[in-house]
Amino acid sequence: MCTVVVSVAPGSAWPVVFLGLRDEVADRPWDAPAAWWPELGDRVEGVRDREAGGAWLATATAPARASVVLNRREEPAPPAGGWTTRGALPLSAAASGALPGGRPTTRAFNLLAADADGARVASWDGAGLTTETLAPGVHVLTHGSTDDLDVPRVARWLPRFRGVEAPTGPPTGPAGASTGPDDGDRGRWEPWLALLRESTELPADHDEALVRADLLDGRWFGSLSLSLVAVSADQVRHEHHRLDRASPLVGHFA
Protein backbone atom coordinates (compact mmCIF):
# COMPACT_ATOMS: atom_id res chain seq x y z
CA MET A 1 0.00 0.00 0.00
CA CYS A 2 1.16 3.54 -0.78
CA THR A 3 2.62 5.98 1.74
CA VAL A 4 2.31 9.78 1.80
CA VAL A 5 4.08 12.09 4.26
CA VAL A 6 2.62 15.61 4.27
CA SER A 7 3.58 18.83 6.04
CA VAL A 8 1.04 21.62 6.52
CA ALA A 9 2.53 25.03 7.37
CA PRO A 10 -0.10 27.79 7.16
CA GLY A 11 1.25 31.23 6.33
CA SER A 12 4.45 29.94 4.74
CA ALA A 13 5.44 30.55 1.13
CA TRP A 14 4.69 26.89 0.35
CA PRO A 15 1.91 25.94 2.80
CA VAL A 16 1.72 22.25 1.81
CA VAL A 17 4.52 19.90 0.82
CA PHE A 18 4.30 16.14 0.57
CA LEU A 19 6.29 13.06 -0.29
CA GLY A 20 4.51 10.15 -1.95
CA LEU A 21 5.64 6.56 -2.47
CA ARG A 22 3.49 4.76 -5.04
CA ASP A 23 3.12 1.02 -4.43
CA GLU A 24 1.74 -1.03 -7.31
CA VAL A 25 2.09 -4.31 -9.16
CA ALA A 26 5.29 -3.95 -11.17
CA ASP A 27 3.86 -5.15 -14.48
CA ARG A 28 0.85 -2.81 -14.42
CA PRO A 29 1.62 -0.19 -17.10
CA TRP A 30 1.84 3.47 -16.12
CA ASP A 31 3.33 6.75 -17.29
CA ALA A 32 5.31 9.52 -15.62
CA PRO A 33 3.57 12.86 -14.96
CA ALA A 34 2.27 14.72 -18.01
CA ALA A 35 -0.96 16.21 -19.36
CA TRP A 36 -2.41 12.84 -20.41
CA TRP A 37 -6.08 13.91 -20.28
CA PRO A 38 -7.00 16.21 -23.20
CA GLU A 39 -10.43 16.92 -21.73
CA LEU A 40 -8.71 18.58 -18.76
CA GLY A 41 -6.33 20.69 -20.83
CA ASP A 42 -2.67 21.41 -20.26
CA ARG A 43 -3.13 22.68 -16.71
CA VAL A 44 -3.68 19.19 -15.23
CA GLU A 45 -0.84 16.69 -15.15
CA GLY A 46 -0.57 13.36 -13.42
CA VAL A 47 1.01 9.94 -12.99
CA ARG A 48 -1.20 7.95 -15.38
CA ASP A 49 -2.43 4.40 -14.86
CA ARG A 50 -2.72 3.11 -18.43
CA GLU A 51 -4.90 0.18 -17.40
CA ALA A 52 -7.76 2.16 -15.80
CA GLY A 53 -7.05 5.53 -17.39
CA GLY A 54 -6.90 7.57 -14.19
CA ALA A 55 -4.10 9.03 -12.09
CA TRP A 56 -2.43 8.13 -8.84
CA LEU A 57 -1.27 11.71 -8.27
CA ALA A 58 -2.38 14.83 -10.14
CA THR A 59 -1.41 18.50 -10.10
CA ALA A 60 -3.05 21.57 -11.60
CA THR A 61 -2.13 25.19 -12.23
CA ALA A 62 -4.28 28.34 -12.15
CA PRO A 63 -5.11 27.74 -9.35
CA ALA A 64 -2.34 25.58 -7.93
CA ARG A 65 -3.52 22.27 -6.50
CA ALA A 66 -2.25 18.74 -5.93
CA SER A 67 -4.04 15.52 -5.04
CA VAL A 68 -3.09 11.89 -4.49
CA VAL A 69 -5.17 8.78 -3.84
CA LEU A 70 -4.24 5.81 -1.64
CA ASN A 71 -6.02 2.47 -1.47
CA ARG A 72 -7.56 1.59 1.89
CA ARG A 73 -7.63 -1.90 3.35
CA GLU A 74 -11.43 -2.34 3.51
CA GLU A 75 -13.25 -4.27 0.78
CA PRO A 76 -16.75 -2.82 0.29
CA ALA A 77 -19.43 -4.66 -1.64
CA PRO A 78 -19.41 -3.73 -5.33
CA PRO A 79 -22.07 -1.22 -6.45
CA ALA A 80 -24.88 -2.33 -8.75
CA GLY A 81 -23.34 -0.59 -11.75
CA GLY A 82 -19.82 -1.92 -11.12
CA TRP A 83 -16.71 -0.18 -9.90
CA THR A 84 -15.43 3.14 -11.15
CA THR A 85 -11.70 3.84 -10.95
CA ARG A 86 -10.20 5.59 -7.94
CA GLY A 87 -7.84 7.23 -10.42
CA ALA A 88 -10.57 9.72 -11.38
CA LEU A 89 -10.53 11.18 -7.86
CA PRO A 90 -7.18 13.04 -7.86
CA LEU A 91 -7.88 14.33 -11.37
CA SER A 92 -11.19 15.82 -10.24
CA ALA A 93 -9.75 17.22 -7.02
CA ALA A 94 -6.81 18.83 -8.81
CA ALA A 95 -8.89 20.21 -11.66
CA SER A 96 -11.82 21.58 -9.66
CA GLY A 97 -10.85 21.51 -6.00
CA ALA A 98 -13.92 19.37 -5.30
CA LEU A 99 -13.84 16.34 -3.03
CA PRO A 100 -16.13 13.35 -3.63
CA GLY A 101 -19.61 13.37 -2.14
CA GLY A 102 -22.55 11.02 -1.82
CA ARG A 103 -21.82 7.30 -1.89
CA PRO A 104 -18.70 6.60 -3.97
CA THR A 105 -18.77 3.83 -6.56
CA THR A 106 -15.06 3.14 -6.13
CA ARG A 107 -13.24 0.75 -3.88
CA ALA A 108 -12.10 2.16 -0.51
CA PHE A 109 -9.68 5.09 -0.57
CA ASN A 110 -7.95 7.96 1.17
CA LEU A 111 -7.72 11.09 -0.99
CA LEU A 112 -5.37 13.94 -0.11
CA ALA A 113 -6.20 17.31 -1.70
CA ALA A 114 -3.82 20.24 -1.20
CA ASP A 115 -3.86 23.91 -2.14
CA ALA A 116 -2.61 27.18 -0.70
CA ASP A 117 -5.29 27.05 2.01
CA GLY A 118 -4.09 23.72 3.40
CA ALA A 119 -4.76 20.01 3.02
CA ARG A 120 -7.90 17.91 3.31
CA VAL A 121 -8.38 14.15 3.37
CA ALA A 122 -11.51 12.42 2.11
CA SER A 123 -11.83 8.80 3.28
CA TRP A 124 -14.21 6.10 2.04
CA ASP A 125 -14.17 2.80 3.90
CA GLY A 126 -17.22 1.26 2.24
CA ALA A 127 -19.51 2.25 5.11
CA GLY A 128 -19.16 6.03 5.18
CA LEU A 129 -17.43 8.95 3.49
CA THR A 130 -15.67 11.42 5.77
CA THR A 131 -13.63 14.57 5.21
CA GLU A 132 -11.06 16.10 7.55
CA THR A 133 -8.84 19.17 7.38
CA LEU A 134 -5.29 18.34 8.41
CA ALA A 135 -3.96 20.32 11.35
CA PRO A 136 -0.66 22.18 10.99
CA GLY A 137 2.28 19.83 11.26
CA VAL A 138 3.39 16.53 9.76
CA HIS A 139 1.07 13.62 9.00
CA VAL A 140 1.37 10.17 7.40
CA LEU A 141 -1.30 8.55 5.22
CA THR A 142 -1.41 4.87 4.29
CA HIS A 143 -4.28 2.36 4.00
CA GLY A 144 -5.89 3.25 7.34
CA SER A 145 -6.88 6.46 9.06
CA THR A 146 -4.66 9.54 9.11
CA ASP A 147 -1.63 8.99 11.39
CA ASP A 148 -2.87 5.46 12.08
CA LEU A 149 -0.52 4.04 14.70
CA ASP A 150 -1.99 0.57 14.16
CA VAL A 151 -0.09 0.54 10.84
CA PRO A 152 3.47 -0.56 11.74
CA ARG A 153 5.28 1.77 9.35
CA VAL A 154 3.27 4.74 10.61
CA ALA A 155 4.00 3.86 14.24
CA ARG A 156 7.72 3.65 13.50
CA TRP A 157 8.23 6.56 11.12
CA LEU A 158 5.65 9.23 12.00
CA PRO A 159 7.57 10.29 15.14
CA ARG A 160 10.79 10.33 13.13
CA PHE A 161 9.35 12.58 10.41
CA ARG A 162 7.91 14.86 13.06
CA GLY A 163 11.30 14.98 14.75
CA VAL A 164 13.18 16.48 11.79
CA GLU A 165 12.82 19.70 9.84
CA ALA A 166 10.09 19.51 7.22
CA PRO A 167 10.70 20.73 3.66
CA THR A 168 10.05 24.42 3.09
CA GLY A 169 9.42 24.40 -0.65
CA PRO A 170 9.99 22.50 -3.87
CA PRO A 171 13.19 20.46 -4.21
CA THR A 172 14.16 22.25 -7.41
CA GLY A 173 13.22 25.47 -9.11
CA PRO A 174 12.63 26.13 -12.80
CA ALA A 175 14.99 24.20 -15.07
CA GLY A 176 16.43 22.39 -12.06
CA ALA A 177 17.65 25.52 -10.29
CA SER A 178 18.19 25.28 -6.54
CA THR A 179 15.36 26.74 -4.48
CA GLY A 180 17.50 27.78 -1.54
CA PRO A 181 20.22 30.35 -0.90
CA ASP A 182 22.92 27.73 -1.28
CA ASP A 183 23.43 25.25 -4.10
CA GLY A 184 21.99 21.89 -3.17
CA ASP A 185 19.54 23.23 -0.59
CA ARG A 186 16.73 21.42 -2.45
CA GLY A 187 14.04 23.15 -0.41
CA ARG A 188 15.43 21.44 2.71
CA TRP A 189 14.13 18.01 1.69
CA GLU A 190 17.27 16.26 2.87
CA PRO A 191 16.01 15.35 6.39
CA TRP A 192 13.01 13.54 4.89
CA LEU A 193 15.08 11.89 2.18
CA ALA A 194 17.60 10.77 4.78
CA LEU A 195 14.80 8.99 6.65
CA LEU A 196 13.75 7.28 3.42
CA ARG A 197 17.31 6.08 2.89
CA GLU A 198 17.46 4.86 6.47
CA SER A 199 14.20 2.98 5.99
CA THR A 200 15.71 0.94 3.14
CA GLU A 201 17.95 -0.77 5.70
CA LEU A 202 14.86 -2.81 6.62
CA PRO A 203 13.93 -5.81 4.48
CA ALA A 204 11.65 -4.56 1.72
CA ASP A 205 8.86 -6.91 2.87
CA HIS A 206 9.10 -5.80 6.51
CA ASP A 207 5.87 -4.40 7.99
CA GLU A 208 7.70 -1.19 8.96
CA ALA A 209 9.37 -0.63 5.58
CA LEU A 210 8.50 2.54 3.68
CA VAL A 211 10.10 1.56 0.37
CA ARG A 212 8.46 -1.79 -0.15
CA ALA A 213 8.77 -4.93 -2.29
CA ASP A 214 7.03 -8.28 -1.99
CA LEU A 215 5.37 -11.02 -4.01
CA LEU A 216 1.58 -10.75 -4.27
CA ASP A 217 -0.11 -13.78 -5.82
CA GLY A 218 3.08 -14.52 -7.73
CA ARG A 219 3.52 -10.95 -9.02
CA TRP A 220 6.07 -8.47 -7.76
CA PHE A 221 4.45 -5.61 -5.87
CA GLY A 222 6.33 -2.65 -4.46
CA SER A 223 7.29 1.01 -4.43
CA LEU A 224 7.57 2.00 -8.08
CA SER A 225 7.99 5.75 -7.84
CA LEU A 226 8.69 8.66 -5.52
CA SER A 227 7.02 12.07 -5.81
CA LEU A 228 8.10 15.28 -4.07
CA VAL A 229 5.36 17.92 -4.28
CA ALA A 230 5.07 21.52 -3.08
CA VAL A 231 2.08 23.85 -3.37
CA SER A 232 2.07 27.64 -3.03
CA ALA A 233 -0.53 30.31 -3.73
CA ASP A 234 0.30 30.39 -7.43
CA GLN A 235 2.60 27.44 -8.15
CA VAL A 236 2.74 23.69 -7.84
CA ARG A 237 5.94 21.70 -8.32
CA HIS A 238 6.19 17.94 -8.71
CA GLU A 239 9.54 16.17 -8.88
CA HIS A 240 9.04 12.55 -9.87
CA HIS A 241 11.44 9.59 -9.81
CA ARG A 242 11.01 6.00 -10.92
CA LEU A 243 12.48 3.64 -8.35
CA ASP A 244 14.64 0.65 -9.17
CA ARG A 245 13.36 -2.59 -7.67
CA ALA A 246 16.84 -3.79 -6.82
CA SER A 247 18.19 -0.59 -5.29
CA PRO A 248 15.46 1.94 -4.49
CA LEU A 249 16.67 5.53 -3.97
CA VAL A 250 20.24 4.66 -4.92
CA GLY A 251 21.43 7.00 -7.64
CA HIS A 252 18.75 9.57 -6.89
CA PHE A 253 19.48 10.61 -3.33
CA ALA A 254 22.76 8.96 -2.37
Language-model region placement:
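N-terminal nucleophile
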Residues: M1-A254
